[in-house]
């Protein structure tokens, strides 16, 4: 497969979902909560079906007063993926070893809050030479303006990316050899009957 700087493939990408926890989501105003959960479950299921490595993070879930797990939509699809818990807003230092272990240099990042944890992590990864694509409809800010401003900053770095459905539909149907196809996932999450 091609691996050009503008190409996102199932073989060169890592999905990074940052802090999709109920207490963080409570203050998100830039996307409907139900839509956010649906999109997250859909992209997580797509990545799983396509064998794309997945890295999850939480903030303050262990040892903090909040002890807040991930949103149910994620844990239902990825019950065996253990989140990396941290205490700082920039997840990059904590997730870098997991990203490096995949051997992949393209990150598909979604997170809460867009303007804080997601933006800081994306900028740090870009500074280290990673290609970063922001998944807008699996992310949320504390206001529409904050979310849009963060998107604009990332777009200035020319690293804006797909929506959850666009990532799902990029996979070949059926996949070569019939082994990896996200068509059933796309049908379940993005084309409900």
Q: Predicted segment positions?
A:
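Short acidic, Gly/Ser-rich segments with clustered Asp/Glu that frequently serve as metal-coordination loops
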Residues: 21-27
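Short acidic catalytic loops
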Residues: 14-21
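A cross-domain feature marking catalytic cores of carbohydrate-active enzymes
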Residues: 20, 56-59, 136
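A short alpha/beta connector and helix-capping loop motif
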Residues: 11-13, 28-56
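Active-site-adjacent betaalpha module
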Residues: 2-14, 50, 61-193
